């Protein structure tokens, strides 16, 4: 996994404003692929739970926005587990958001869903070419709103993208809105973003904002 730290305090930059623009430009390049598969709907794929029960995705998650964390044989590290748990805690107050784990490898010990072998599910499996654990944000209608989306450790970004997905917004659009919404003083430009941050995190924004953007192999 390559990780681009979206930190506005970069000592190698001569001018803070130009540095901010450079980092924002790099971040936009990373998030532009989140919406590659918004035309794909996975409502009808079959998932198998840890007890061997098989159900369709839309039966399991009716009316829910799903943060679907998938991995092959490379499981989450201790740090990844921690950031994932903290993300779940922050979204516990939203009843329309759920978190689900999906194992596409040979790990039989994990408490995660696995994919069935029917035709519709096989098409989704073909999209899951991942080396590192990767999140997929699924909308309430079953559309893939964020493909290899922001990871739990992607501070602020993952929260905003998942929050906006509750209203059907695709990951690229919401991520770019957030990135664009930070000014040269490392602060939110709009009252809307400041209010969202205060409500979601239950605190006022820091004087110097920082967040990160991760790519998935």
Model-derived segments and their meaning:
Residues 143-217:
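Thiol-/selenol-based redox modules, centered on thioredoxin-like
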Residues 1-8:
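Bacterial N-terminal signal peptides that target proteins for export
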Residues 15-18:
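C-terminal motif of bacterial Sec signal peptides marking the signal peptidase cleavage site
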